[in-house]
């Protein structure tokens, strides 16, 4: 197996949070909080796409177009904060293994991206956190605030862009979080390059000259009679012949 990779980048939607980034990746016109709604939207654009969790990938998957979801890195970061960093190498190895599995199954190209990145804020004292700006603040999160008016504050970045019910977004100029509830250490939603620059990687199998066929029900062929078969080309390699 000889794999060639192209490392490109893209910009995440802002705020760099899951529901916003995923809605964009799945082609939604508006921000959709429910994952199944996002999946349904993609299927209206690409009817033959199959969307499954990465850990469910196996040789029985025969979708022509396949989207694999893997959210463990984000979930571990949210739960364990800094302690979750030690798990990332294992997750990277797992994803790499699954990419090789896809090529072994006959897929010619694999694209890897993410809904957002993250920033490591470290363990902070309360004095290190940024006060929430004064004004008509609709929602305040660790890495951004939403409002319906402009604020004259030189210490924050103001973005005039509608997001859900708000008209303005406010971001810290550093990796420090706004004062908010919850644990600190791992965060996303903000404006730093670590949060809003995402991978757009392409991997291709250079050894794939022709697609192989893996027949899983060979015993059923013993009951098939006749001289000629009509073969239709398929774009996947795992083929189950009818019984």
What function would you assign to each model-found segment?
Residues 2-60, 160, 165-166, 176:
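Active-site nucleophile/metal-coordination loop of metallo-enzymes that catalyze phosphate/sulfate
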Residues 99-128:
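Metal-dependent active-site segment of extracytoplasmic phospho-/sulfohydrolases and closely related
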Residues 78-110:
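A long, amphipathic alpha-helix that forms part
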Residues 2, 80-86, 120-137:
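Short secondary-structure boundary/capping segments
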Residues 67-75:
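Short loop/turn segments at strand-loop or loop-helix junctions that form parts
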Residues 237-242:
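Conserved small/polar residues in nucleotide/adenosyl-binding loops
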Residues 127-129, 134-232:
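Active-site neighborhoods of enzymes that stabilize oxyanions during catalysis
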Residues 1, 74-78, 118-121, 207-208:
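Flexible loop/turn segments at secondary-structure boundaries
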């Amino acid at each position: 197996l000889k794999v060639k990779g192209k490392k490109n980048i893209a910009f995440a939607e802002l705020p760099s949070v899951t529901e916003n980034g995923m809605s964009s990746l799945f082609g939604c016109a508006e921000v959709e909080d429910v994952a199944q709604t996002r999946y349904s939207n993609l299927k209206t654009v690409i009817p033959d796409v199959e969307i499954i969790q990465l850990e469910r990938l196996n040789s029985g998957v025969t979708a022509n177009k396949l989207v694999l979801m893997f959210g463990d890195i984000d979930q571990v970061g949210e739960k364990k904060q800094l302690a979750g960093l030690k798990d990332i190498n294992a997750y990277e190895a797992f994803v790499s293994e699954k990419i090789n599995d896809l090529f072994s199954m006959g897929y010619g190209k694999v694209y890897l991206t993410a809904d957002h990145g993250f920033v490591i804020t470290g363990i902070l004292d309360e004095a290190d956190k940024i006060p929430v700006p004064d004004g008509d603040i609709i929602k305040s999160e660790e890495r951004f605030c939403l409002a319906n008016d402009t604020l004259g504050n030189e210490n924050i970045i103001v973005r005039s862009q509608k997001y859900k019910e708000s008209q303005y977004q406010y971001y810290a100029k550093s990796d420090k979080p706004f004062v908010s509830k919850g644990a600190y250490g791992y965060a996303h939603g903000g404006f730093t390059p670590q949060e809003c620059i995402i991978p757009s990687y392409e991997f291709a199998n250079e050894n794939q000259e022709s697609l192989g066929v893996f027949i899983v029900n060979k015993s059923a062929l013993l009951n098939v009679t006749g001289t000629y078969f009509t073969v239709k080309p398929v774009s996947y390699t795992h083929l189950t012949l009818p019984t």
